Amino acid sequence: MIGGFQSCFNRGNFCRRCCINYEDRNLPLPLSHIKVRTVVDHDKTVQEIKSNPNKSSLMGVVGESPLHELIGFHPILSLPGDLMHDFIEGVCPIIIMSLLKQASSMRLITYAGIQKRMENFKYGYFDTSDQPPPIQVKHLNNGHIVATAAQKPCIFKLFPIIFHDFIYHLPSFIVYKVLREILDLVLSYPFRKQWLPVLEDLCNTFNQIMILHFPTKIIPKAHFIREYERMIHDFGPSIKYWCFRYEAGHAYFKKIAMRTNNFKNTPKMLVTHYRLKQCFKFELRKFEVLALMHQ
């Protein structure tokens, strides 16, 4: 990993910003009671691992970062979390799936009814481009929402509208409402410093109600949400360093790989297609400029 941390999140000290243990993630510990990683402690840990090759990892650290010689870089200070993976592809789909399963267990709606509701829902003009596929019965059985990173926020945002007739009967709907407020704040740009205490209170509340309503669904990303107040304080608005735009580029290359059906030297093939696309765009701009000049 680029920071020299362990790549496994289901054991040990999985967090890169504090020293919480995986077994303690379900405990109602205030964030102020959890030891924060510091530059000095991290450097000592790295030196201890280098001096003892038999240690595979220590406090979630597996070794020195490949970028340790880069001026101004340090794994503790230079690696903020990613809003897209923590919220949009992490906790949000889990909460939606948990609420739908709770509604089914309370006999408010069946799995088949959920699928039919999603298939018949009419999306608005601004949501049609990111219209998600319907949540099918097999997805509910597997506990996994099949959608892209752009489609999952659409499901999360429209969830109270699609299932408006029974959501207020769910005892755990408060989890969705608090998470929705947190998401609205972390997506804000510009982000005002006066909002940081509000975000901190919401994140602490979210942790408490998750322990109360969905204790088995507290994954490491649910803990990462608690640290967004510190993260935004240190790095600024979270949408300035999220991976959403990189995912868009990744989707383009996946489409090219599937459409060409060429599996020999795939990197060269992808680079060639992308360079041709860029050349076409640049030449098109030249023609547009010439056309304007002649006019």
Label for each model-derived stretch:
Residues 1-151, 155-158, 163-165:
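Domain-level detector for long, ordered catalytic/regulatory cores in large eukaryotic signaling
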Residues 19, 111-295:
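Terminal interaction-prone segments of large eukaryotic proteins
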